[in-house]
Amino acid sequence: MNGYVDFSPSPTSPTKEPGAPQPTQAVLQEDVDMSSGSSGNENCSTGRDSQGSDCDDNGKELRMLVESSNTHPSPDDAFRLMMTEAEHNPSTSGCSSEQSAKADAHKELIRTLKELKVHLPADKKAKGKASTLATLKYALRSVKQVKANEEYYQLLMSSESQPCSVDVPSYSMEQVEGITSEYIVKNADMFAVAVSLVSGKILYISNQVASIFHCKKDAFSDAKFVEFLAPHDVSVFHSYTTPYKLPPWSVCSGLDSFTQECMEEKSFFCRVSVGKHHENEIRYQPFRMTPYLVKVQEQQGAESQLCCLLLAERVHSGYEAPRIPPEKRIFTTTHTPNCLFQAVDERAVPLLGYLPQDLIETPVLVQLHPSDRPLMLAIHKKILQAGGQPFDYSPIRFRTRNGEYITLDTSWSSFINPWSRKISFIIGRHKVRVGPLNEDVFAAPPCPEEKTPHPSVQELTEQIHRLLMQPVPHSGSSGYGSLGSNGSHEHLMSQTSSSDSNGQEESHRRRSGIFKTSGKIQTKSHVSHESGGQKEASVAEMQSSPPAQVKAVTTIERDSSGASLPKASFPEELAYKNQPPCSYQQISCLDSVIRYLESCSEAATLKRKCEFPANIPSRKATVSPGLHSGEAARPSKVTSHTEVSAHLSSLTLPGKAESVVSLTSQCSYSSTIVHVGDKKPQPELETVEDMASGPESLDGAAGGLSQEKGPLQKLGLTKEVLAAHTQKEEQGFLQRFREVSRLSALQAHCQNYLQERSRAQASDRGLRNTSGLESSWKKTGKNRKLKSKRVKTRDSSESTGSGGPVSHRPPLMGLNATAWSPSDTSQSSCPSAPFPTAVPAYPLPVFQAPGIVSTPGTVVAPPAATHTGFTMPVVPMGTQPEFAVQPLPFAAPLAPVMAFMLPSYPFPPATPNLPQAFLPSQPHFPAHPTLASEITPASQAEFPSRTSTLRQPCACPVTPPAGTVALGRASPPLFQSRGSSPLQLNLLQLEEAPEGSTGAAGTLGTTGTAASGLDCTSGTSRDRQPKAPPTCNEPSDTQNSDAISTSSDLLNLLLGEDLCSATGSALSRSGASATSDSLGSSSLGFGTSQSGAGSSDTSHTSKYFGSIDSSENNHKAKMIPDTEESEQFIKYVLQDPIWLLMANTDDSIMMTYQLPSRDLQAVLKEDQEKLKLLQRSQPRFTEGQRRELREVHPWVHTGGLPTAIDVTGCVYCESEEKGNICLPYEEDSPSPGLCDTSEAKEEEGEQLTGPRIEAQT
């Protein structure tokens, strides 16, 4: 609006109006020029063409205005005006032509004032009538605004001309005409214009304007382009032609069609007019303008100016030729809860006749048919109930620009603010069902539009606003991108219901359908809405993949532990949560975003690495607080973020699927929302419980569970009950979040120390994380192939019955990581097909509770600390229905067994030297009834029973998955194995030391079996069994086992010197080979037991665990016949530097049971330095605080430790003899009072096997 169109008085028949003031033409014409710039809308003849007294009134107002004008402040202004009138208009009766000119000028003045009054906003009118004074003030203010805009442009150009002009090409006038002609010559309704960004003047305009506007091209010469725009479109023009927003022409020219379509997103709409088409009206025509940035050289040798090159195309009605096909007459609008348009799709322009800026911030109800306005209240009630989900409703009639009504079929949805749970805006996707009678929607309305809303409209708007101010119930939308918040197909159906055949318009709309308004947030929401269907499809496809399923199920399993979260968690997680607690909605929303981003970045990798989403047994009881500390003792950095997201959304879920959580929560939405009667067929919780039934996929399980949704609707859950339940869950979630955050301070300080302690095993950390899912792709190289199946099966064996922190399982040699999943159980536990020979089922050494001395034939009760709901199969020693095995002198509450079939090697049918109490009771195997006749005890060394101090067991067995041919619900049998050959058992008997017991204790505590001291004394040694490679996959622990897990063939080299490690494979002849200080297999670099069963987490690794997992080699029952092949496998799979070194080491050196010695003083010095670092994080109390602490805690006054943690030895220690060293296991929970025993503790039989190994830190 830099200037205005000058209107010369048109000759009309003279009309005398006596008594009317007759100001001079010069003075009045100047006033008209100053105030008539905002000349009219489509038709500006809507004012009264008054005569007589009306003219007198207008003349009086004008005279009063001139007299009081600030530009003529002197008191004799009126006199001066009258004198001027007298000089230029002498009163002569013969000058009729002069009188006629005066009359024409006065009439033109009055008409111009009326045109200005039409543009006066309604809020500036007094009692609905526009006064001349208010109109002229409004015009003057508009002129000042335009001048301010010009000054702004000049300042902008002076500051930005240098950076903007660097890459902007410069063209002459002829070149501009040449580069634009190829675009506009093909379209008669398009023209090109170059507008200076400095002065706003038109430097170039194409010849097509003459035919489009029916005027001469000279009308645009030396004029400002905004003079030809409709007044309310000037601001839109300025906002879209800001220099830094404009793409340079050189970038846009010569590009492919897709890029050009993308650049069309910069286009906007304006109305342009040139002069009058009729006597009393100015007709504007709508144009779509696409701006570009160029430099134009106006004259030869002159300096180039930054210009905006506009390609303007006239917009025709969508109902006139060329018509828009009926199936593509679709557009989208959004409006606020107070029923004001927030954004309008550009596709609405040819269908409604309105430009986007015409509707934005105007009432929606005003544009509707009066009979349809009450429907909007019902529609908004349903919008509130739908909670963001789209739905169709009754058609509504919408008024177009020409005053006609069109009928629209609309799909309504909403966006819910995740923080406030209130509706932010409503989205309407409209499809024109019936077009207008007058197809020219851009025609002027026959009557002026109502300026003030009808009272009923205002009342209805208030009702809708009050309605939408209520929080949306948690019925199905997480409020974050809630157009597809639940990933349900219902949204896709409802979207296509109103636009089934949108065709290519959809793709174009996604590129160029961004609203040309200042509301950027609405634009983003619109884009999200348009692509919602495709996003949901991709999300659904992602969910169908095994990785997504595993991740979702794992999340639920971790979260089902409930109270375990505050006790222990990841160091990274706690550090992440070291923030002020936010609201539930904020945490849930951030959780959704994190998991969505992780799913996008990890989906491809996880899909390639995970193969068994349904092989995760469920927990059927509340897990003890120590669960996560054991699981997450050594998290990898990659895993930590996943774990944070998992725990952020942790809500205690019921045992049944009364509250259904959508699987989509793991990628884009919160998993804490409770859905009742939801149509999504992915109830996670029941899916988790049913996963144990077999190797069927998660989708299959979820599909079966979807049929159980019917009864859910009959449970009597009302909105009130659901809201109360949801609020309770949210409060519990926030409470646990705060409790976990309290541990962040201590955990953050310990993290550096823990990382330093485990530097040497950084390469193995990915194998000991919690989920096992991430560990499968943590490693690279050849190990990646081996890790593909090493996903941790999350059975309840990770929980402890005593409630203490859980220790890590030592690595299992020759076992398959997936053996305990339902899909592989048939291979791991008992083979489905018989083999030539059955090796006896060696038991796991089970330990009884402290103070109980086992004797042969004695039945020891299982530990009482097991969790409720876990099945504890205890077979009495005297009753063995299926297996002809003999009871073990130790307590066998779980009594697992593993039969290992050898294809060719004949084993002795019986073992006369085997003690009566060697083998434990074996549980019943219903799936393999014939196995009892096949399995016979192998020759083993005698194990004279001896009394020993036993420890408190830690048992957490779980109920077996249906269809799993595994040991009742005992934990994997090989987790408790102490040896697999007579020689190994001999060594076990000879060299069983406190560390062996503690290692086994930690192991068994981790795996969920009873942990107790192993009673072993000296016995006669026997020769090794001949080599016979295993053919059956055996269970393994992915958390602890990796490519360096021992191979059964490798251990043939080591049986002569091998100790009885707690990680031995029961029947693979691999046993557990480790040095006397590694008996928790920390030598393997795995997580050791809670009792510290392992050497230091630095570099003291065993020289005997250097082979591949037999489950990887023998997954398809492959056999390795001899030691030479074993050695080849050693060299093939050993990838970590230590194992590569050991693989190339001579066998004689490998069998020396020697470990690199460390200087005791150096170790102590390092420890002292680390303690000094940790000392800084010790709390410092003021004197007042210390006084309060002494009053409450007496031990603070004495300077000692609390009784609960002031222990002289570890609870797992078998003996408290001199020299025992109890060290806390750093990687576990930092809870006080939990300590480990070093693996370096030796016992009586130590002198029989070799020198004592010092404990390493």
From Swiss-Prot:
Residue ranges occupied by any PAS domain in the UniProt entry: 179-246, 319-385
Post-translational modification: Acetylated. Deacetylated by SIRT1, resulting in decreased protein stability. Deacetylated by SIRT6, preventing its degradation by the proteasome, resulting in increased protein stability. Phosphorylated by CSNK1E and CSNK1D. Phosphorylation results in PER2 protein degradation. May be dephosphorylated by PP1.
Annotated segments matching region CSNK1E binding domain: 510-709
A Pfam family per the record: PAS_3
Gene Ontology CC annotations of this record: Cry-Per complex; cytoplasm; cytosol; nucleoplasm; nucleus; perinuclear region of cytoplasm
Motif LXXLL mapped to chain: 306-310, 1051-1055
Localisation: Nucleus; Cytoplasm; Cytoplasm, Perinuclear region
UniProt modified residues of type Phosphoserine: 525, 528, 531, 538, 544, 659, 693, 697, 706, 758, 763, 939, 971, 1126
Region (Disordered): 1-60, 471-565, 617-638, 757-832, 994-1044, 1070-1115, 1224-1257
Major location (coarse): nucleus
Tissue: In the brain, high expression in SCN during the subjective day. Constitutive expression in the cornu ammonis and in the dentate gyrus of the hippocampus. Also expressed in the piriform cortex and the glomeruli of the olfactory bulb, and at a lower extent in the cerebral cortex. Not expressed in the pars tuberalis and the Purkinje neurons. Also expressed in adipose tissue (white and brown), heart, kidney, bladder, lumbar spinal cord, skeletal muscle, spleen, lung, pancreas and liver with highest levels in skeletal muscle and liver and lowest levels in spleen.
Function: Transcriptional repressor which forms a core component of the circadian clock. The circadian clock, an internal time-keeping system, regulates various physiological processes through the generation of approximately 24 hour circadian rhythms in gene expression, which are translated into rhythms in metabolism and behavior. It is derived from the Latin roots 'circa' (about) and 'diem' (day) and acts as an important regulator of a wide array of physiological functions including metabolism, sleep, body temperature, blood pressure, endocrine, immune, cardiovascular, and renal function.
Protein name: Period circadian protein homolog 2
Gene: Per2
